[in-house]
């Protein structure tokens, strides 16, 4: 079976170059070196004041008809900043997260892998599990808080319509509750430590 055409992405906001180097660039360097299947890598940005000038990253403010060959990653920057309001009001995150579906459909990707910019895949076992995931909407369990962790998700093409239905609810509706309790996951993988901060190993 041929691998699914895969989009790997994180969401982003960085105030300056130091923040970019410490977080998003570090995320890129780590995940680009893994045997994680991907056909394109995007950093989807909530109108940061800083825009990277790294030679292997192409900055986009609109989706072109076809992705140019050459860049190792694309930095898609929205023109306006949504940000965050209180605990659940992650407007910027929701917009960036859901825009991954627009990218996938625009370029024929069949699987979306979301690894948040402060999350890192640390074992070959979880990389192999993600590579082998070809259906459903998968999240990984966070035992520290007893919820699925939305910082690590795999959305296969059979769930793209479900993701579109989430997007149709709009940012105002989506930001009244935690993403952990809102996203309609079809599979929650409990055999892994799905934590960003290392509270549970």
Model feature map: region roles:
Residues 121-124, 142-152, 158-201:
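Catalytic core and acceptor-binding pocket of nucleotide-sugar-dependent glycosyltransferases
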Residues 85, 108-120:
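Short beta-strand-to-loop acidic/aromatic patch adjacent to the donor-nucleotide binding site
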Residues 5-6, 32-42:
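Short loop->beta transition adjacent to catalytic acidic/histidine clusters or analogous donor-positioning motifs
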Residues 44-107:
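Active-site-proximal specificity loops/subdomain of glycosyltransferases
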Residues 1-29:
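N-proximal low-complexity "stem/linker" segments adjacent to membrane-targeting elements
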Residues 20-31, 93-98, 124-127, 175-182:
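Well-ordered, non-membrane alpha-helical segments in soluble/globular domains
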Residues 117-131:
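Acidic donor-binding/catalytic loop of UDP-sugar-dependent glycosyltransferases
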Residues 106-107, 127, 131-140:
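Conserved donor NDP-sugar-binding/catalytic core segment of glycosyltransferases
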């Amino acid at each position: 079976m041929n691998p699914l055409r895969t989009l790997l992405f994180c969401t982003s906001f960085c105030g300056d170059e130091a923040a970019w180097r410490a977080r998003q660039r570090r995320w890129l360097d780590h995940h680009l070196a893994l045997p994680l299947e991907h056909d394109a890598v995007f950093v989807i940005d909530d109108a940061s004041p800083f825009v990277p000038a790294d030679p292997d990253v192409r900055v986009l403010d609109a989706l072109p008809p076809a992705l140019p060959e050459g860049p190792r990653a694309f930095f898609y920057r929205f023109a306006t900043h949504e940000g965050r309001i209180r605990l659940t009001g992650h407007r910027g995150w929701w917009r960036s997260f859901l825009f991954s579906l627009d990218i996938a459909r625009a370029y024929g990707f069949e699987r979306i892998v979301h690894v948040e910019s402060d999350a890192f895949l640390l074992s070959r076992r979880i990389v192999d599990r993600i590579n082998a995931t070809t259906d459903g909407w998968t999240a990984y369990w966070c035992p520290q808080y007893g919820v699925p962790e939305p910082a690590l998700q795999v959305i296969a093409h059979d769930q793209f319509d479900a993701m579109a239905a989430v997007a149709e609810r709009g940012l105002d509706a989506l930001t009244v509750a935690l993403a952990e309790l809102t996203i309609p996951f079809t599979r929650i993988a409990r055999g892994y430590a799905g934590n960003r901060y290392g509270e549970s190993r």
